[in-house]
């Protein structure tokens, strides 16, 4: 499978789940997909090193390596991934700074 085909397949995976993406490297998309599959199979978010945000306890941040995060929301006891974003963008959002 070519890298462009792989990227297209991964993008489709996230689109089917209505997960917003920013421009992430291929290895990050692959790891994020594995983590999302584990969530969908019932793995508790804390076993994926996820933590609830202090500012909004319904939001869970799951690390995807050192520089990326999946933001998910607790909807009726189910953790639903909503966004994949860089750690820099994550920090800006939670510090209340405007995006570039």
Tell where the protein language model's regions lie, with residue ranges.
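Enriched for short, Lys/Arg-rich terminal
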Residues: 1-11, 57-100
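Arg/Lys-rich, positively charged N-terminal/basic patches that mediate binding to nucleic acids
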Residues: 1-37
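General structural signal for secondary-structure boundaries
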Residues: 11-14, 43, 47, 86
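A short, surface-exposed loop/turn module that caps and links secondary-structure elements
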Residues: 36-62
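A generic structural signal for solvent-exposed, polar alpha-helical segments
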Residues: 19-20, 51-52, 74, 96
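Charged/polar, solvent-exposed surface patches and flexible loops
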Residues: 30, 34-41, 92, 96
